[in-house]
Amino acid sequence: MPSLPQEGVIQGPSPLDLNTELPYQSTMKRKVRKKKKKGTITANVAGTKFEIVRLVIDEMGFMKTPDEDETSNLIWCDSAVQQEKISELQNYQRINHFPGMGEICRKDFLARNMTKMIKSRPLDYTFVPRTWIFPAEYTQFQNYVKELKKKRKQKTFIVKPANGAMGHGISLIRNGDKLPSQDHLIVQEYIEKPFLMEGYKFDLRIYILVTSCDPLKIFLYHDGLVRMGTEKYIPPNESNLTQLYMHLTNYSVNKHNEHFERDETENKGSKRSIKWFTEFLQANQHDVAKFWSDISELVVKTLIVAEPHVLHAYRMCRPGQPPGSESVCFEVLGFDILLDRKLKPWLLEINRAPSFGTDQKIDYDVKRGVLLNALKLLNIRTSDKRRNLAKQKAEAQRRLYGQNSIKRLLPGSSDWEQQRHQLERRKEELKERLAQVRKQISREEHENRHMGNYRRIYPPEDKALLEKYENLLAVAFQTFLSGRAASFQRELNNPLKRMKEEDILDLLEQCEIDDEKLMGKTTKTRGPKPLCSMPESTEIMKRPKYCSSDSSYDSSSSSSESDENEKEEYQNKKREKQVTYNLKPSNHYKLIQQPSSIRRSVSCPRSISAQSPSSGDTRPFSAQQMISVSRPTSASRSHSLNRASSYMRHLPHSNDACSTNSQVSESLRQLKTKEQEDDLTSQTLFVLKDMKIRFPGKSDAESELLIEDIIDNWKYHKTKVASYWLIKLDSVKQRKVLDIVKTSIRTVLPRIWKVPDVEEVNLYRIFNRVFNRLLWSRGQGLWNCFCDSGSSWESIFNKSPEVVTPLQLQCCQRLVELCKQCLLVVYKYATDKRGSLSGIGPDWGNSRYLLPGSTQFFLRTPTYNLKYNSPGMTRSNVLFTSRYGHL
């Protein structure tokens, strides 16, 4: 009888014993497909033969995908790609070539396009040797040679194949009659007096990164290669025309010469670094700044020639892309530049697929930096793919359900409907531009942090230089795309293009006010809701789906950075939706006008002021009663609506006597108001000077000592404070830091000025402008106050026609000082709570959302006998109730 199986043992065929001594043993293994890690950036490098590209991909933490994978975040190819491939790319993908760049990378195309631009702007394009394209310009070349013979002059010409590379087929001639007329050749005048180094001729390989063509963005790498000839240079004559090692500087040619010197250092051998070359120039009393300026100008002007072709081809490949969207293309170009004996740069050629071979250590050092910094500038994030899919889904729903779309205006619509329609269109245009500006600010901040050895040369910071380049761009579009030049000119001249974020917000506010007046609603001065102090770490915001738990903060550095960018974008969207409530109130008026006036303005197609009856309510004394001021005329805004209250009107003039009496009484009333306002401003300044920021758990004296200690050791704390304020805190948290000061002021001012609403005080509106300036450019305004430009915020008053009195300016200066102290105390508290900012792990960057508790920071405000009880004490003022209980 067979025995029962033991419990838990499953009977079956006996397993094969693989540990046998048979001569053959199967070694076949099951292929296991490697899974992609969630949140990993992928790269397809099947199209490159250069190992340095793969090494940099690994160093960046990207995961290489199989050759057939076309969904990678990054695709790298050595050769140019077809336009169909670019058309098939998703928005989250990047490929390292632009369509249409061959217009300057092929020798014949470059010569043809440069010739056209030279005809239009001869004084701007003097850096290209005179060139002829054979066979089309064979006759012109022969005529030029005959003219030289008549003048008894003889020049040397260099002959190149039209689409050659690596020095193949290049020769020098002095007799132009011997050239064949039907071959496809490029003939250039030879630069006979080059700048020599140790007696050798050389050229420069400059690396250029183009990250976008719509709009154009160009970066220059501040290093490169100096490629020297391998025979001492002698001006060309009949006996040495064939000595190519003397006249050509191509590495692919000179490396075959026995005199080619390979050296591991950057200051010896036949190949050296541009970094060493600039030091050489400086040591020999040459102007290095002018050298880089000339190189930058040459590069930008050359790419301006390519821009019409590249932009047209790119838009054909990517139709329907909204302006300002991320470019799926980028390109690393190699510019070959020759210097003459006066250090003037001459453009030889441009390589769209520069060699990334690393035969020597100097190649590895330079080219690794070029690639590594370029990939960092691209800002490829793990969340790009997910956000792209979500955006596509939202766009599909919008098209399906007609969401957020403006209804068409029907024929025969009334004037009221036409005005509403124009306002809606204007608001949509402004919101789109606002989103573009915020994206651009975010990109520029990332570029400034990750530029490495690159420098942005277009668009330049110099306004005059930018205007010069834009004029050249307009000429280039007119020259190469004459049929589409008008549309490009309209884009270039769009008044919204040069506006900053705060200007667009002002225009949006204007449209909102016009809309409310058109609808017959009561217009209220709007501004951000008062926030009492710092946020709690557990109640920071309503998190989106991508931020489900705090455990996500423990991810890799690249993932954390992408999540940070994603949260920033989420906040931008949130701000955009609430744009009505985040607008800066502006009640400065210049001229007394009828409230019912309707005027054209840049802010909206038709400015409408509601015809409301005059109000009988009297308002408290403030600067607004003195004079009515409109917003200034500027390049970005030509006019703005009159926002004066309905009670300020022209008085009817029955006769000359009544008119004279009313003018005298009005002057006396304004004089009395001015004196009272100065007195109240002095009281405000006195209170502001006594205000102090208190460190949690410490006395006033101890808090002052902490601030003084930070200031005394500013060299040590400067970088840490900058990192905390500009990087670790986003714009929402920065605003909440300043709200500690702002809330205290909102509490004090009504008691001094004896008004129920602080918004009615002109000084508070000035304070609001200062707060907005301090938060300008993601907190850069406040940080400038710690630097040499500590009074840069005062420039906001230079552009305004409203006169700010010395007392008001002193109040603003004290306000800025309180904000600086507040930041230092919050920074110190965060440092003590978390430990040294420099001694913690990489996950510290995510602590930007973990700010100190809200009830621990406050301004100690002195108590004065102000004898005014606000009828509407808001919840945000609860911190100060105990201190003003006796009032």
Curated annotation (Swiss-Prot):
What are the GO cellular component annotations? ciliary basal body; cytosol; dendrite; microtubule; perikaryon
This protein's assembly is summarised as: Interacts with both alpha- and beta-tubulin (via C-terminal tubulin tails).
Effect of changing R227E: reported as: Nearly abolished polyglutamylase activity
GO terms assigned for molecular function: alpha-tubulin binding; ATP binding; beta-tubulin binding; metal ion binding; protein-glutamic acid ligase activity, elongating; protein-glutamic acid ligase activity, initiating; tubulin binding; tubulin-glutamic acid ligase activity
Name of the gene this protein is made from: TTLL7
* Enzyme Commission number(s) from the entry: 6.3.2.-
Enumerate the SUPFAM superfamilies for this protein: Glutathione synthetase ATP-binding domain-like
Q: What is this protein called?
A: Tubulin polyglutamylase TTLL7
Entry function: Polyglutamylase which modifies tubulin, generating polyglutamate side chains of variable lengths on the gamma-carboxyl group of specific glutamate residues within the C-terminal tail of tubulin. Mediates both ATP-dependent initiation and elongation steps of the polyglutamylation reaction. Preferentially modifies the beta-tubulin tail over an alpha-tail. Competes with monoglycylase TTLL3 for modification site on beta-tubulin substrate, thereby creating an anticorrelation between glycylation and glutamylation reactions.
GO biological process entries: cell differentiation; microtubule cytoskeleton organization; nervous system development; protein polyglutamylation
